[in-house]
Amino acid sequence: MARYTRRKILKTAAAASAFTLAAPYVRGAYAAGTLSLGCWDHWVPGANATFTKLCNEWGEKNKVEVKIDYITSQGEKDKLTAAAEAQAGAGHDIMTHRDWNINVHRDKLVPIDDVVNGLIKQYGPISVVAEYLAKIKGNWHGVPTTVGSQVKPCCSRFDLYKEHAGLDLREIFPADEVKWDKAKVDAWTWDAYLASAEKLFKAGFPVGLPMGQSSDAVDWVSALFKSYGVVFMDEKSTIKIDSAETRQAMEMARKIMAVSPPDVYAWDDAGNNRWLISGKGAGIMNPPSAWAVAKKDNPKVAENCWTHPMPKGPKGRFVGQLPIFYGIWAFSKNQSAAKDLLTYVSQKDSARQLVAASSGYDLPSFKAFYDFDTWKTVEPPVGTVYNYPPRGDEQTSMAGYPAPPDVSAQLYNQALPTVMVSKFTQGKEKLDEVIKWAANELEGYQRT
């Protein structure tokens, strides 16, 4: 997607709400009225209809008319709409916000600790990435959605890996975590990934990892960095990018880029999808969207796709996560009803229906929801996206963590991780100079 930029991240946090919602969902009683939502427009046919159905069910029970506008993310229209509504102080009651947009608009959003803490009480721990993006100065300002939220693990052609790299990915990561062999899983490291990528490159089927300024590029590179222990800036605002860990990760990225298609530096978020669907590529790092499109456009490719965990680095196994959030504008006249609706659509049964409607693309932020049958049953082949939810030792990550959100938002939106790699690999700049440049960029983020 296009990068969303601004001069400054807004600084003011809204006051906290102390009330904690009871564990079970209990509908409220509201005066007749309307509740309007501006929602991310899903790319999966029928997914919007399922969300509309859930909202209408709640509306009929509570005698509230629910109006939904589905807003495309093409050209960042959803973010531009949110920015316009925040400035005008008028618009929808509830708005969806991608990546760092909760932080951007936090002083215009109602604190919703009661909703999120109630869900945590029901379902247990929530994604650390969701907390990093939406819990600001101790208070939740957004509810993680099921709709559109995603992680970006490996999606690989298991036939090509077996033929040309000698790896049976379905044997390493079968569609049943109980059957995983720890020794085989532990052997799936970045060194193993590189060795297989080199063989696939020689065979004429390179992996396709973008290195532009799109979110897909930033997310996979950030997961690589995290697995090597790279820290851009710590929570105390100390710049840490000049480290042995950074140099190790950059060298691995350099080696991977050497066996990648040369045009990956210009790819947008659709580039890696097109690469896999074309049949030319052996693998990407992405949600199962490419597989879903291939089912129609190139069935032979889809039949040989297998989603599985990311490679492991010296500091662990990490996968990029990109949640979407619901936020309630402070100007909303029906905030109580808005909170109740968000609680309803966040229930496990609601999430189950939404995941099914998206063929497993949508990923809730609660690990307690990772047992849905959809990931076990969608095909072809059966089990192809079972490993899409993080399982085993795979942890979610977000670029910039644990730096202060105002810094990480700029780091993400300006694609600092991929620009670093591009300077080093495509630009042939010296590694020390690239790291020095990145440190200067981080200093600049602190001043804005």
Task: Give residue ranges: language-model regions.
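Extracytoplasmic/periplasmic substrate-recognition and gating elements
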Residues: A32-S36, N56, E60-N62, K135-G138, ...
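Short helix-initiation/N-cap motifs at beta->coil->alpha
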Residues: I71-T81, A187-A192, V264-S278
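Hinge/lid segment of periplasmic solute-binding proteins
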Residues: R98-C155, D159-K162, N304-P311, E379-N387, ...
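Short, solvent-exposed loop/beta-turn-alpha elements that line the ligand-binding surface or hinge
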Residues: D114-S127, L167-D186, Y228-A249, K296-P299, ...
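Glycine-centered hinge/linker elements that transmit conformational signals in sensory
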Residues: W190-F201, E235-A266, M310
